[in-house]
From Swiss-Prot:
GO terms for cellular component: basal plasma membrane; membrane; monoatomic ion channel complex; plasma membrane. Residues 592-606 have a biased composition (Basic and acidic residues). The chain crosses the membrane at residues 98-119, 131-153, 170-192, 204-224, 237-259, 295-323. Pore-forming subunit of the voltage-gated potassium (Kv) channel involved in the regulation of sensory cells excitability in the cochlea. KCNQ4/Kv7.4 channel is composed of 4 pore-forming subunits assembled as tetramers. Promotes the outflow of potassium ions in the repolarization phase of action potential which plays a role in regulating membrane potential of excitable cells. The channel conducts a slowly activating and deactivating current. Current often shows some inward rectification at positive potentials. Residues 120-130, 193-203, 260-271, 294 are extracellular. Residues 343-352, 536-550 are annotated as: Interaction with CALM. This is Potassium voltage-gated channel subfamily KQT member 4.
């Protein structure tokens, strides 16, 4: 029964459209799997695994419906809209690079309005300044009005400012409120000035100085105010102390000078006049409108001036030092932020070096990464084919094989195999199959497991491109079924494995003869270890470079960093010394004068013995006790033996009293022969000797 030829794709993608070709291939494979799994209608799935509706068209060039095309166009327009909105918001709220040009232009406009507002108060330049200011105000209204509207619109790129409620929340920000107030005041001034209203020359003229608020809006992000607030908050206790003492000095100085000068000096007729004098004097302004006349008042003023000025000047020094420390801290923070990228690169390089180890074959992410960036090996196959054509006199390998060769004529060059031998992954010139590194690793590992006999019987599956030529299985015995994987991102790229092309004219005997006679020169098993070695060497070099760059960023920034490094090293050294001391105490054993023993009190005998058994000194003492016990027992045995020798008779042997062995209570060693057993054996020996004597 002849097998049905493989189904071709109805919608072939163009050669240069790789993403759409991948989409078509995935859809076709899903449909084939659905037909093979169930006998009913195929159930097609999308790229994310969600089932497609039954009436959904097959994705391909020209096959999409009008609604789908309209949806794609609307999605693209939405992306462009969001991108433009985000770009405008960054230009207005977070300017960088050339965006500062616009903000400098706005600053010049605001500064020009401020200068003209000042000149409009001078009688000589009032008319010219008012005319120029009127024109500039029109320009400012247009610019600020458009900018305010664009700011509110571009705020929609942030999630919290989307929708009407989000826009209203953005409009309630302090700087937006200032912009709105200045805009309304400018419109009111221009409207009243153009109508020639007399009221505009009196009441609305003062509204022009609301333009001073425009200078506040120059710092949209409030960096200066945040810096000042952080410095004041960091040194709040010192500032409160200095201000409190200065205020007390001001009150006492003003009151005492008022008591001394109120009768003799009309300038100090009230306590308020004295407070004014004290404020001007202690702040070192010194207008000179009020001065003490009496000697008592002058002495008090001099004493309190020397004491109070120092406290009034303290906040300036505190704020100055705080600003200096804050700037230094910001520089240090920037220096530390420069370490993030080298540290991340070092971690990534270390992990990739770890994952490329040959003993960790289960880590495949790094191999997938290099599989996506490795160059195509199709040029290598073309180079082999070009060399063979040059050796064959300009003919292709198939033409050389089909050309008749006279009998007995020697061949100039050895023939080159052009067909794929089953069971071997080899490079043969022909049609290339697009196969990734992970598939080649899987095939090579399966070949090593199955062995040469099984490899010869069952050729490894080689995935082929759907857009390539499909040859029927009836005409091509070496046809290999398609093997697709949804995670295979490299199936449309040339690879190391090249598929041969065998014509139908060749017989089976010729194929077998060629398989037995010739072998391909380059195999995947030969190339893949070399590629892995090269990749691992590259990972080692990248790891060393990342390590060197990270060490360069660890250089100390200033003296404070050096002190911190020394203190950290000192703490580390103390910890190591403490650990070493604990180990020495454990080896030698803790004596009676140990500090912990004195602090926690005396331990029980069981605890002391347990501690002694752990320490080396306790073990040495235990061995010494056992040796003493053995020596004592040996002395007793030698004494018993010497008495037996001196008596010389068996009767004396029975009369000799065997000394009892006192077991050493302090020793853990006990002899397997007890002293009772020794006495019993001695009595048995004496009885046996007496019996033998009587028999004689």
């Amino acid at each position: 029964m002849a097998e049905a030829p493989p189904r071709r794709l109805g919608l072939g993608p163009p050669p240069g459209d790789a993403p759409r070709a991948e989409l078509v291939a995935l859809t076709a494979v899903q449909s084939e799997q659905g037909e093979a799994g169930g006998g009913g209608s195929p159930r097609r799935l999308g790229l994310l695994g969600s089932p497609l509706p039954p009436g959904a068209p097959l994705p391909g060039p020209g096959s999409g419906s009008g609604s789908a095309c309209g949806g794609q166009r609307s999605s693209a327009a939405q992306k462009r809209y969001r991108r433009l909105q985000n770009w405008v918001y960054n230009v207005l709220e977070r300017p960088r690079g050339w965006a500062f040009v616009y903000h400098v232009f706005i600053f010049l406009l605001v500064f020009s309005c401020l200068v003209l507002s000042v000149l409009s108060t001078i009688q000589e330049h009032q008319e010219l300044a008012n005319e120029c200011l009127l024109i500039l105000e029109f320009v400012m209204i247009v610019v600020f009005g458009l900018e305010y509207i664009i700011r509110v619109w571009s705020a929609g790129c942030c999630c919290r400012y989307r929708g009407w409620q989000g826009r209203f929340r953005f409009a309630r920000k302090p700087f937006c409120v200032i912009d709105f107030i200045v805009f309304v005041a400018s419109v009111a001034v221009i409207a009243a000035g153009t109508q020639g209203n007399i009221f505009a020359t009196s009441a609305l003229r003062s509204m022009r100085f609301l333009q001073i608020l425009r200078m506040v809006r120059m710092d949209r992000r409030g960096g200066t105010w945040k810096l000042l607030g952080s410095v004041v908050y960091a040194h709040s206790k010192e500032l409160i102390t200095a201000w409190y003492i200065g205020f007390l000095v001001l009150i006492f100085a003003s009151f005492l000078v008022y008591l001394a000068e109120k009768d003799a000096n009309s300038d100090f007729s009230s306590y308020a006049d004295s407070l004014w004098w004290g404020t001007i004097t202690l702040t070192t302004i010194g207008y000179g409108d009020k001065t003490p006349h009496t000697w008592l008042g002058r002495v008090l003023a001099a004493g309190f001036a020397l004491l109070g000025i120092s406290f009034f000047a303290l906040p300036a020094g505190i704020l100055g030092s705080g600003f200096a420390l804050k700037v230094q801290e910001q520089h240090r923070q920037k220096h530390f932020e420069k370490r993030r990228m080298p540290a991340a690169n070092l971690i990534q390089a270390a992990w990739r070096l770890y994952s490329t180890d040959t003993s960790r074959a289960y880590l495949t992410a790094t191999w997938y990464y290099y599989d996506s960036i490795l160059p195509s090996f199709r040029e290598l196959a073309l180079l082999f084919e070009h060399i063979q054509r040059a050796r064959n006199g300009g003919l292709r390998p198939l033409e050389v094989r089909r050309a008749p060769v006279p009998d007995g004529a020697p061949s100039r060059y050895p023939p080159v195999a052009t067909c794929h031998r089953p069971g071997s992954a080899s490079f043969c010139p022909g049609e290339s199959s697009r196969m990734g590194i992970k598939d080649r690793i899987r095939i090579s590992s399966s070949q090593k497991r199955t062995g040469p006999s099984k490899q010869h019987l069952a050729p490894p599956p080689i995935p082929t491109s759907p857009s390539s030529e499909q040859v029927g299985e009836a005409s091509s015995p070496s046809k290999v079924q398609k093997s697709w994987s949804f995670n295979d991102r490299t199936r449309f790229r040339a690879s190391l494995r090249l598929k041969p092309r065998c014509s139908a004219e060749e017989g089976p005997s010729e194929e077998v003869a060629e398989e037995k006679s010739y072998q391909c020169e380059l195999t995947v098993d030969d190339v893949m270890p070399a590629v892995k070695t090269v990749i691992r060497s590259v990972r080692i070099l990248k790891f060393l470079v990342a390590k060197r760059k990270f060490k360069e960023t660890l250089r100390p920034y200033d003296v404070k960093d050096v002190i911190e490094q020394y203190s950290a090293g000192h703490l580390d050294m103390l910890g190591r010394i403490k650990s070493l001391q604990a180990r020495v105490d454990q080896i030698v054993g803790r004596g009676p004068g140990d500090r912990k023993t004195r602090e926690k009190g005396d331990k029980g005998p069981s605890d002391t013995e347990a501690v002694d058994e752990i320490s080396m000194m306790g073990r040495v003492v235990k061995v010494e006790k056992q040796v003493q016990s053995i020596e004592h027992k040996l002395d007793l045995l030698l004494g018993f033996y010497s008495r037996c020798l001196r008596s010389g008779t068996s009767a004396s042997l029975g009369t000799v009293q065997v000394p009892l062995f006192d077991p050493d209570i302090t020793s853990d060693y006990h002899s397997p022969v007890d002293h009772e057993d020794i006495s019993v054996s001695a009595q048995t020996l004496s009885i046996s000797r007496s019996v033998s004597t009587n028999m004689d």
